Amino acid sequence: MPQLSQTVLIQNRLGLHARAAVKLVQLAQSFDAVLTVQSQDGREATADSVMGLLMLESAQGQNVVISAEGSQAEQALQAVCQLIEQKFDEDE
């Protein structure tokens, strides 16, 4: 099964902080897919680890690459990218 990936811009003011990471992990775990997030500096974490995502230190204005593999990879990738593009549903 091919791996899909997409680059997305972190737009929310606080970046990929704890609350945003929890939302991303919960969403990622709802799909039958393995998702990874790669920061601009090349560090990578699986999307099922809040601590791993926090260690990426992805801030507002930085791009991250989301990769997905598995039977629901396309849906998972689309949903996670949409969550990030919608600023993790946070009010600014």
Curated annotation (Swiss-Prot):
Localization recorded for this chain is: Cytoplasm
Instruction: Please state every residue range assigned to the domain named HPr.
Output: 3-91
Principal location: cytoplasm
Residues forming the catalytic site: H17
InterPro entries per UniProt = HPr, HPr-like, HPr-like_sf, PTS_HPr_His_P_site, PTS_HPr_Ser_P_site
Which keywords appear in this protein's UniProt record, sorted alphabetically?
Cytoplasm, Phosphotransferase system
Return one Gene Ontology term, BP aspect.
phosphoenolpyruvate-dependent sugar phosphotransferase system
PROSITE patterns recorded? PTS_HPR_DOM (PS51350), PTS_HPR_HIS (PS00369), PTS_HPR_SER (PS00589)
GO terms for CC? cytoplasm
Q: Which family does it belong to?
A: Belongs to the HPr family.
What functional role does this protein have? Answer: Component of the phosphoenolpyruvate-dependent nitrogen-metabolic phosphotransferase system (nitrogen-metabolic PTS), that seems to be involved in regulating nitrogen metabolism. The phosphoryl group from phosphoenolpyruvate (PEP) is transferred to the phosphoryl carrier protein NPr by enzyme I-Ntr. Phospho-NPr then transfers it to EIIA-Ntr. Could function in the transcriptional regulation of sigma-54 dependent operons in conjunction with the NPr (PtsO) and EIIA-Ntr (PtsN) proteins.
What this protein is called in its record is Phosphocarrier protein NPr
**Naturally occurring in which organism (per UniProt):** Vibrio cholerae serotype O1 (strain ATCC 39315 / El Tor Inaba N16961)
This chain is encoded by the gene named npr
